């Protein structure tokens, strides 16, 4: 009985409060659990194919010999544009090799729950007068047309309104520049930056110091000076240190270059604005030409819409799932050893001309004897990692006060770049899954 007493004494007292608390836990256990998020799937770059090049101890012997007059390595936008250029020049035998299973590179798209979405680049700004080749192609595919001497864009493919908004101080505001009091120091600094951008856009010679493509603008000592200092340093020396302005300029650099204002050059930071739509402080109105150039083409699948139209003329001449292993320049030709992922065999291509439309660090690795210029350029270039995540929502997001849902939605202070609603271009009048 002694042991029995000891056991009885060891039992905890069960008060009413403890009973109520434990009952609550039991009832909570009976509540329906939130469904787990569906597992994520990786549909990006086929990294294991690239690792085949990195990890190979020796190159496999070719099982097949193939020939082409022109061989383009890489079917991203650069490779597709190069192939188009050769075709327009009358070269019929243009072949393309692409590591992925679809052309487009950083402009590929995807389908999620039956809805198209981008895997990378998702818009194209209306080209300026210097981008003649881009404008000509957009005319060819019907995105641009000439009316009474003016270039007019097909509004069906322009980003629908509202285009962008920013989340700041607990509410959404129109545009991407945080709203400020026009009489504040923030507004004064924004006007000062706007004036500086305008001066670079309209030099004494009457021409802009910046343009797209950049090589069509003459390089000079002033631009070289901008290129030797960071954008942040250039802003600091001019007293442009307002938190709202600096956040926006930093966001613009991260969005376009993958690096912050304290890393990119002042030339790059100013180029973002001066080569296109400029910078407009609160209360400043854009001119008619600037308003037109602020428009962007976009589609649910992003720039995959464009990539598909660039790739369409090549059809059977576009060889996807081909990993380039080696490029060797001979006296009379160039040989390219590639691994065909579908056939699981190595293939040797021989061409008169080879275009390396590849990232520089890959080009420097696959070329048998890379020239000094390629090695130096690859060593100097830094790459910034980035990730595009597509989420399927059963219904529209619960919205907060302020500006209505837009195509581009950015959060002040976030390390990310915001989110784009791929279904913003939908003509369905009733909001739904996105």
PLM regions: where:
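Glycine-rich Rossmann-fold phosphate-binding loop(s) that bind the pyrophosphate
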Residues: 74-76
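N-terminal Rossmann-fold NAD(P) dinucleotide-binding loop
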Residues: 79
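Extreme N-terminal leader/targeting segments of oxidoreductases
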Residues: 2-69, 88
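Conserved hydrophobic helix-helix packing surfaces used for dimerization/oligomerization
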Residues: 70-72, 94
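Glycine-rich FAD pyrophosphate-binding loop
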Residues: 87-110
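Mid-domain catalytic core of redox enzymes
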Residues: 320-434
